[in-house]
């Protein structure tokens, strides 16, 4: 799987981004919010990715942060939510507010997103409330690393742990650890309990 790409921006045509990575051009579909954060054409950029392989297409989605990509992966697990609707969700609300709306059961805020009706909003709340309640994406930079603790929490949530479990597992660890060490040690702590 392609987890990230670093290259030069060839074209920005929302929702499409063309990225040149050592002579190979990649076409990525991104949430509209990502285009506000990225530099101009010709600049270097790192994009976190999700690859979907279907019978009729290979689709590469791009995200400015790991937490945003993890949010996308949670969204597409919900029955009736595909890549387009998940991108619409992330375009309509920042990942942190989307997570908060789901955790609070705020279906009115969710139905304000194009493509999300009342039934879909309810389904999002029911299926994701326990998984999304603690996602807090790191700073929305230019694809750089966010807070390793927040990214580790997002990784644990993606693995199916509840927000309280993930936060508690990370809270007890020493400061200054890298992302991989945080995840490894928190998984060891969680397996003991």
From Swiss-Prot:
Its main location: cytoplasm. It holds the Pfam family RuvA_N. Keywords: Cytoplasm, DNA damage, DNA recombination, DNA repair, DNA-binding. Belongs to the RuvA family. InterPro entries: DNA_helicase_Holl-junc_RuvA_I, Hlx-hairpin-Hlx_DNA-bd_motif, NA-bd_OB-fold, RuvA, RuvA_2-like, RuvA_C, RuvA_C_sf. It comes from Acidithiobacillus ferrooxidans (strain ATCC 23270 / DSM 14882 / CIP 104768 / NCIMB 8455). One of its GO terms (cellular component) is cytoplasm. Residues 139-143 are annotated as: Flexible linker. This is Holliday junction branch migration complex subunit RuvA. It is found in: Cytoplasm. Residues 65-139 are annotated as: Domain II. GO terms for biological process: DNA recombination; DNA repair. Residues 144-193 are annotated as: Domain III. Has three domains with a flexible linker between the domains II and III and assumes an 'L' shape. Domain III is highly mobile and contacts RuvB.
């Amino acid at each position: 799987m392609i987890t990230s790409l670093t290259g030069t921006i060839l074209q920005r045509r929302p929702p499409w981004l063309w990225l040149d990575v050592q002579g190979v051009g990649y076409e990525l579909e991104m949430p509209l919010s990502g285009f506000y954060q990225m530099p101009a054409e010709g600049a270097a950029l790192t994009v976190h990715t999700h690859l979907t392989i279907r019978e009729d297409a290979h689709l590469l989605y791009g995200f400015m942060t790991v937490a945003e990509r993890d949010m996308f992966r949670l969204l597409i697990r919900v029955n009736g939510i595909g890549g387009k609707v998940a991108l619409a969700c992330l375009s309509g609300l920042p990942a942190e507010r989307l997570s908060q709306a789901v955790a609070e059961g705020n279906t009115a805020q969710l139905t304000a997103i194009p493509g999300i009706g009342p039934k879909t909003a309810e389904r999002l709340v029911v299926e994701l409330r326990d998984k999304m309640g603690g996602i807090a994406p790191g700073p929305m930079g230019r694809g750089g690393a966010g807070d390793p603790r927040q990214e580790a929490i997002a990784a644990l949530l993606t693995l199916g742990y509840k927000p309280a479990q993930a936060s508690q597992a990370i809270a007890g660890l020493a400061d200054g650890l890298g992302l991989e060490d945080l995840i490894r040690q928190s998984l060891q702590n969680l397996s003991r309990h």
